[in-house]
Regions:
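General beta-strand structural signal in soluble alpha/beta enzymes
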Residues: 7, 29-32, 50, 99-100, ...
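Intrinsic disorder
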Residues: 70-73
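Class I SAM-dependent methyltransferase SAM-binding "motif I" and its flanking Rossmann-like core
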Residues: 146-163
Length: 163
């Protein structure tokens, strides 16, 4: 599998992130509220993972519409519901894998996205939107570095000051 870029729901420096995404061909995963970054910029991730508790009403509506369109809706996947959808912006048509997690879980949505990436063969994972204002979230995200390393993958927490 090619490299993976996960966009989480924290602070994202828009211009830096958009430029980075253009320059790096990678599998794109939105972790919960990270979906809103993609939708705001008319980009499509390859996968969306989360319990979607922090999505805006527009983000939730997008997922509801996709779920209604899906032929594979409500396929159980170990505590998750998973479906694939096709969505296009302009001329782009793309299949998006959506994994809905149960709200009662031990892992953060970002950690679940990272674990999914590793399970599917990713060895290098870059994560945006994890170096924001909340120190408790930042500390938890530092833990992802060790968790990934223990599973044979390398994680980089990316923002315009750290890459």
């Amino acid at each position: 599998m090619k490299d993976v870029i996960i966009v989480s729901g924290g602070n994202i420096q828009r211009d830096f992130a958009l430029d980075f995404l253009k320059k790096n061909e990678a599998c794109l995963i939105a972790a919960d509220k990270g979906l809103e970054f993609f939708l705001e910029h008319q980009l499509l991730p390859d996968a969306v993972i989360g319990d979607f508790d922090s999505l805006s009403e527009d983000g939730k509506k997008f997922l509801e519409i996709q779920e209604e369109k899906s032929m594979d809706s409500e396929i159980p996947y170990g505590g998750m519901n998973e479906w694939k959808v096709q969505k296009g912006f302009g001329n782009e048509i793309k299949e998006i894998k959506v994994i809905r997690l149960r709200p009662e879980k031990d892992d953060s949505d970002t950690q679940s996205a990272m674990n999914y990436a590793i399970r599917t063969g990713a060895k290098e994972i870059m994560i945006f939107g994890v170096t924001g204002n909340r120190v408790d979230h930042l500390m938890a995200n530092f833990g992802l570095l060790i968790l990934a390393q223990n599973q044979g993958a390398e994680v980089t927490l990316v923002d315009r000051y750290n890459y």
